[in-house]
Curated annotation (Swiss-Prot):
This protein's GO CC annotations: acetyl-CoA carboxylase complex; chloroplast
Family classification: Belongs to the AccA family.
Family annotation (InterPro entries): Acetyl_CoA_COase_a_su, ClpP/crotonase-like_dom_sf, COA_CT_C
NCBIfam families linked: accA (TIGR00513), AccA_sub (NF041504), PRK05724.1 (NF004344)
Protein name as annotated: Acetyl-coenzyme A carboxylase carboxyl transferase subunit alpha
Species in which this protein is naturally found: Antithamnion sp.
UniProt xrefs under HAMAP family: AcetylCoA_CT_alpha
Localization in the cell: Plastid, Chloroplast
MF term (GO), any: acetyl-CoA carboxylase activity
UniProt entry tagged with the keyword Transferase: yes
Pfam families per record: ACCA (PF03255)
Gene: accA
Subunit details: Acetyl-CoA carboxylase is a heterohexamer composed of biotin carboxyl carrier protein (accB), biotin carboxylase (accC) and two subunits each of ACCase subunit alpha (accA) and ACCase subunit beta (accD).
Length: 322
């Protein structure tokens, strides 16, 4: 049985109830071999059927709640499964080392890459340390330092996006949060090396964009990407955060909506039940996709990369008025 680290979401309760029944019956079958194994098999088939029904009909808001669960794989979880010889690098060379945005060197298929990503915590204490994945200006400047390092030594860049947004405190504004993100956007347009950005959880506003300019933008199936959280959007437009369900629908935050709109390039399939169900399988699928995309981008010249990158990102700002 899967151990849930947090209280389950309401829409997952049928799954939890069946998992509990399967767990109890498995223990009984182990102790008493004469018990009918067919009952256990039937329950497992029923569990798969229920999961398919639930996860094929998730609302945008349910997907958002799903990716906010603490048992969902983080950047460091994916790095541990995807990269070899990982070495984390620290500091922005300006006096700070933000734990909410991590980066370093590693190898994927024997090719050295620079990997950068938002890092959420696994529990309350860790989340406080990581500021819930909300990076400070120093975090974005650290990311820029590492990306410049990658550009200098011709290392491809991989970024993993998972943040509710950039840190919005008074100190963040005082230290130049907007400027730090804007400089990252400008510089990422100019790099000569391939850049692949993957939204692994919550892609929130400018905090996501600060490491989100890429030649390929991938998105995990259940991840979300939005200019503002549905709660914030509802509070702004309707003065009522309870309207977040309608806001989530209108914002088009899911991978399928964003693929149709041309905001992302491709959707990375997740295991049934989400990446938190099987982080190893989720990492294997993502690894395979990253290798495929990286091999393609490495076949292009640096001039061609930039020629394609700039209009691709600029098209994201296109909209139509009804």
């Amino acid at each position: 049985m899967i151990t849930r680290k947090t209280l389950s979401l309401n829409f997952l309760k049928p799954v939890l109830e069946l998992e509990y029944q399967i767990d109890q019956l498995s223990k009984m079958t182990y102790k008493n071999k004469s018990l009918n194994i067919h009952d256990l098999t039937a329950l497992k088939k029923q569990l798969i059927k229920i999961k398919i029904e639930i996860f094929q009909s998730l609302t945008p808001l349910q997907r958002l709640h799903l990716v906010r669960q603490v048992d969902r794989p983080t950047t460091l979880d994916y790095i541990g499964h995807i990269l070899d010889d990982w070495i984390e690098l620290h500091g922005d060379r300006g006096g700070t080392d933000d734990p909410a945005l991590i980066g370093g060197l590693g190898k994927i298929n024997n090719r050295t890459v620079v990997c950068i990503g938002h890092q959420r915590g696994k529990d309350t204490k860790d989340n406080v340390l990581r500021n819930f994945g909300m990076a400070s200006p120093g975090g974005y400047r650290k990311a820029l330092r590492l990306m410049k390092h990658a550009n200098r030594f011709n290392f491809p860049i991989l970024t993993f996006i998972d943040t509710p947004g950039a840190w919005a405190g008074v100190d963040a504004e005082r230290l130049g949060q907007g400027e730090a993100i804007a400089v990252n956007l400008r510089e990422m347009f100019s790099f000569n090396v391939p850049i692949i950005c993957t939204i692994i959880g919550e892609g929130g506003s400018g905090g996501a964009l600060g490491i989100g300019v890429g030649d390929k933008v991938l998105m995990l199936e259940d991840a979300v990407y939005t200019v503002a959280t549905p709660e914030a959007c509802a509070a702004i437009l309707w003065k009522d955060s309870k309207q977040s369900l309608e806001a989530a629908e209108a914002l088009k935050i899911t991978s399928y909506d964003l693929k149709a709109l041309g905001i992302i390039d491709d959707i990375v399939e997740e295991p049934l039940g989400g990446s938190q169900e099987d982080s190893l399988l989720a990492s294997h699928i993502l690894h395979s996709k990253l290798v495929t995309e990286l091999n393609y981008l490495l076949s292009l010249s640096s001039d061609k990369l930039k020629e394609l990158r700039i209009p691709k990102i600029r098209r994201m700002g296109t909209f139509y008025e009804g």
